[in-house]
């Protein structure tokens, strides 16, 4: 594995393995303590994206702004 930090897309592809919000929350909790601050910001962005996908039961390249009102 390279030393290059993962991008939002890299994290999103990994998070798409999570099929439920509960599983996603467990992965978020685990990574909260393992990632640096910079990596965590990128990871949280991808996690929010995946949460929107799970909530709407659809995959998105870019989350429409109208979807965010349904996310807790």
UniProtKB/Swiss-Prot annotation:
Phenotypic consequence of gene deletion: Derepression of genes that are usually coregulated by H-NS and Hha.
UniProt xrefs under InterPro entries: Hemolysn_expr_modulating_HHA, HHA_sf
Recorded coiled-coil stretches: none
Keyword list, A-Z: Transcription, Transcription regulation
Residues spanning the membrane: none
Keyword Ribonucleoprotein: no
Known partners and oligomeric status: Interacts with H-NS; crystal structures suggest each subunit of an H-NS dimer could bind 1 Hha monomer.
Protein family according to the UniProt entry: Belongs to the Hha/YmoA/Cnu family.
Job of this protein: Interacts with H-NS and in this complex might contact DNA, which could provide an additional surface for DNA binding to the H-NS-Hha complex; may not bind DNA in the absence of H-NS. In vitro improves the ability of H-NS to bind DNA under a precise set of conditions.
Protein name in the entry: Hemolysin expression-modulating protein Hha
Organism of this sequence: Salmonella typhimurium (strain LT2 / SGSC1412 / ATCC 700720)
